[in-house]
């Protein structure tokens, strides 16, 4: 079963070097095991844009976005046995944040892909 992990946080700073190293080790392990298919960190909101439809009209809004309370900082795509394994993987990933970036608060949202 394919899952996307979406990491959200109100924290706007970069990960610590220690957290980056720990995430790199975890990612390498998961890639070698064939579970992690893709992953990436995202640039700050100021570099992005939103294309919206409001009242039937298209508009483009350049970042940063004032209304953003939580920002998607990164994602990963996994091939796992099911939700239980996905929760265990996400818990391990979030534990790295707790261990190597004290005070950081955020969420790792797990979403299964529709279809094969």
Describe each region flagged by the PLM.
Residues 1-116:
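Conserved, structured core segments of small domains
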